[in-house]
C-alpha cells in the first residue's frame, strides 16, 4: 500500500479534538502524545522480551510488535495530516537527507544539521 493511500484511509478513523484542523494545537498535541504513547508501548514490549524471555523473540512477540507498529503508523499519518503534509513527501525528504549524509560521510554522528 502506498503511504499516501494509507494516510487518506487512516484519516477516516480520526476522531479526536482538533482532527482535520491543521491550525489546531489541540489536534497536534493529541496526535503527538498518542504517537509517543504507542512508541512507548513498543519499547515496553521489547524491554519485557529482554527481561522475561532472555531476548528470545517469538512469533507472538513479532505479531504483538507488528500490531503496535500499526498504531504508531496511524499516529504518524495523523501527525502528517495535522501538519498538512503527505507522508510520501516526508519519507522522500527523509531519504534525501540520509543519502546526502551518507554521500558526505556524516551519516554517523549527532546533530540534525550534519
Swiss-Prot record:
Signal peptide: none annotated. Pfam families: MazG (PF03819). It comes from Mycobacterium phage L5 (Mycobacteriophage L5). SUPFAM superfamilies: all-alpha NTP pyrophosphatases. This is Gene 37 protein.
Amino acid at each position: 500500500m502506498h503511504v499516501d493511500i494509507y494516510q487518506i484511509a487512516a484519516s477516516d478513523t480520526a476522531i479526536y479534538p482538533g482532527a482535520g484542523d491543521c491550525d489546531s494545537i489541540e489536534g497536534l498535541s493529541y496526535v503527538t502524545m498518542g504517537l509517543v504513547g504507542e512508541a512507548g508501548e513498543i519499547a515496553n514490549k521489547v524491554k519485557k522480551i529482554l527481561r522475561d524471555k532472555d531476548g528470545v523473540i517469538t512469533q507472538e512477540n513479532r505479531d504483538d510488535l507488528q500490531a503496535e507498529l500499526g498504531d504508531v503508523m496511524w499516529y504518524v499519518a495523523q501527525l502528517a495530516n495535522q501538519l498538512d503534509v503527505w507522508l510520501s513527501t516526508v519519507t522522500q525528504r527523509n531519504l534525501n537527507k540520509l543519502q546526502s549524509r551518507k554521500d558526505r560521510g556524516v551519516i554517523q554522528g549527532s546533530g540534525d544539521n550534519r
